[in-house]
Amino acid sequence: MRVHITLECTECHERNYLSSKNRRNNPDRVEFKKYCPRDRKVTLHRETK
């Protein structure tokens, strides 16, 4: 079952991206390196509740 998640920047704590994940394959919180428009650089984005 795929669920919608929000990705938050670890540096500025802005919620920049919406995504989906499969809970069966990824039960833990996912992390991606994505572009943060506020910092104007690529930063680590983590899943929020």
UniProtKB/Swiss-Prot annotation:
GO cellular-component terms in the record?
Answer: cytoplasm; ribonucleoprotein complex; ribosome
Protein name stated in the entry? Large ribosomal subunit protein bL33B
List, alphabetically, the HAMAP family matched: Ribosomal_bL33
Q: What is the similarity comment for this entry?
A: Belongs to the bacterial ribosomal protein bL33 family.
| PANTHER family per record | 50S RIBOSOMAL PROTEIN L33, CHLOROPLASTIC (PTHR43168), LARGE RIBOSOMAL SUBUNIT PROTEIN BL33C (PTHR43168:SF2)
A single GO BP term for this record reads: translation
Q: Which UniProt keywords apply?
A: Ribonucleoprotein, Ribosomal protein
